[in-house]
């Protein structure tokens, strides 16, 4: 059994791909009724909460591999790692981005704490340190549709955006056959590095009308994250990453 720890854009796709290839797969979610398509695809949808160790332990029964993907809150992911140790899981595929103990970005310090906890656990592991997701632009879809413009705090920073579906496919493949990937770290990225102005040019070409980019302040970026429904903690993390991208710190 392979356990996927959330059903977000990567977790849901990884679960679907594993079920499609006939692998036994379970996904841990707070509200199973919100993911009927996964159950219909043959995924074992298990109710649980990454804050509650007992529910993680229940989901970890008979699991050999874990795809660890979540908003990267250290206490939650360390709960999963501890549960995997108790269940004698063989391998963990950790989805993450950049990690550093002394980063000015809280999310990256948190990622470092999780990474070190996984390495110290004695579990087999693979780290996928992916670049920024292309799908993050969907948060700006309404603004682009209504104003033919979008703003971020990235400035002139250039990023190799990667498709979250590709990350899901890589994670699923490793979780299903982990032997060749034990202890490895991979850095998935997109095929080219693009500034926000470059991205606006792509939107213009595809949509057949002019789309422009305008820089915004850190405060405006933070509010934009909250406006599209991100929690305060996740919104701050995304905002800090955008600002770091703009300063060439990616």
Model-derived features: where do they sit?
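Short alpha-helical scaffolding segments that buttress acidic/His motifs in well-ordered protein cores
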Residues: 237-242
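Oxidoreductase cofactor-interface core, primarily capturing Rossmann-like NAD(P)-dependent enzymes
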Residues: 1-40, 51-54, 58-65, 70-91, ...
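Conserved SAM-binding strand-loop segment of SAM-dependent methyltransferases
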Residues: 44-47
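NAD(P)-dependent Rossmann-like dehydrogenase/reductase catalytic/cofactor-binding core
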Residues: 243-250
């Amino acid at each position: 059994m392979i356990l996927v720890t959330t059903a977000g854009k990567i977790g849901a796709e990884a679960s679907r791909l594993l079920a499609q290839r006939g692998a036994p797969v379970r996904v841990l979610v707070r509200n199973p009724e919100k993911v009927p398509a996964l159950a219909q695809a043959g995924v074992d949808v298990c109710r649980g909460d990454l804050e509650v160790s007992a529910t993680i332990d229940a989901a970890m029964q008979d699991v050999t591999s874990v795809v660890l993907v979540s908003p990267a809150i250290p206490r939650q992911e360390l709960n999963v790692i501890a549960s995997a140790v108790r269940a004698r899981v063989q391998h963990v595929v950790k989805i993450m981005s950049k990690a550093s103990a002394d980063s000015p970005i809280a999310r990256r310090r948190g990622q470092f704490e999780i990474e070190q906890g996984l390495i110290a656990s004695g579990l087999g592991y693979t780290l996928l340190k992916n670049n920024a997701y292309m799908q993050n632009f969907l948060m700006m879809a309404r603004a682009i549709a209504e104003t033919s413009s979008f703003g971020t705090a990235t400035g002139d920073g250039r990023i190799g955006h990667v498709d979250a579906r590709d990350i899901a496919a890589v994670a699923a493949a490793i979780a299903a056959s982990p032997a060749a990937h034990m202890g490895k770290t991979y850095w998935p990225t997109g095929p080219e590095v693009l500034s926000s102005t470059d991205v606006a040019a792509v939107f213009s070409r595809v949509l057949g009308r002019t789309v422009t980019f305008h820089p915004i302040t850190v405060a405006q970026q933070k509010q934009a994250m909250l406006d599209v429904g991100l929690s305060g903690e996740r919104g701050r993390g995304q905002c800090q990453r955008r600002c770091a991208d703009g300063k060439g710190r990616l």
